[in-house]
């Protein structure tokens, strides 16, 4: 007499295990791209938040001293997929701004020749595709539609209307710069 006839078998068949593995694979194929996009959105928020903080610091400095302060590209290395220490190479310490910890983006403020208008921008290649993502804030001269009396600020990634190779022509808002500078929305 066979002693296994009265006992029921416990466990999963190979087919059942293969179905579970296939379902997990499908879920991973859906979840991983969404997770990567979520990470890129989180990295992007650093640039937007810090541009807004620079704007606040510039306005506070202007209300006290009547002039805006230029900020050299800081950190001097290009923004990338990895965080780097923020090193102020000029200007940001004067207005009292420094980001917390390390940063993905590099930041710059260019002022008009009469120091009554400025453009702040942030740039980084956070997705590693070789093209920088750029965010900016354009503060025009009082009552004006261009930055500065003559409408020039020199070379900067994100520029306003009336400036050669204009990109972001909306004033007083933190917005993505010209789309040719990389994907700004994920």
Q: Where do the protein language model's features map onto the residues?
A:
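N-terminal leader/signal peptides at the extreme start of proteins
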Residues: 1-12
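Short coil/loop residues immediately preceding or within conserved phosphate-binding loops
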Residues: 9, 21, 117
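A short, glycine- and basic residue-enriched loop/turn
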Residues: 9-11, 24, 65
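Alpha-helical hydrophobic helix detector
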Residues: 18-34
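Conserved hydrophobic/amphipathic alpha-helical signal-anchor segments
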Residues: 37-78
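Extracellular/periplasmic head regions of type IV pilus-like filament subunits
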Residues: 63-131
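Short, surface-exposed interaction loops/tails
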Residues: 114-186
């Amino acid at each position: 007499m066979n002693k296994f006839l009265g006992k029921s078998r416990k466990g999963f068949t190979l087919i059942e295990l293969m179905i579970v593995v296939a379902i997990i694979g499908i879920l991973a194929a859906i979840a991983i791209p969404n997770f990567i996009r979520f990470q890129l959105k989180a990295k992007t928020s650093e640039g937007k938040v810090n541009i807004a903080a620079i704007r606040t610091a510039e306005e506070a400095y202007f209300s006290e001293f009547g002039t805006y302060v230029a900020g050299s590209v800081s950190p001097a290395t290009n923004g990338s997929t990895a965080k780097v220490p923020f090193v102020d190479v000029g200007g940001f310490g004067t207005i009292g701004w420094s980001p917390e910890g390390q940063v993905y983006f590099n930041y710059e403020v260019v002022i008009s020749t009469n120091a009554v208008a400025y453009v702040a921008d942030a740039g980084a290649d956070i997705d590693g595709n070789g093209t920088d993502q750029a965010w900016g804030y354009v503060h025009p001269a009082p009552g004006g539609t261009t930055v500065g009396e003559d409408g020039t600020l020199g070379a900067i990634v994100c520029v306003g209307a009336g400036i050669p190779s204009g990109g972001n022509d909306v004033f007083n808002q933190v917005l993505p710069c010209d789309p040719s500078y990389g994907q700004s929305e994920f």
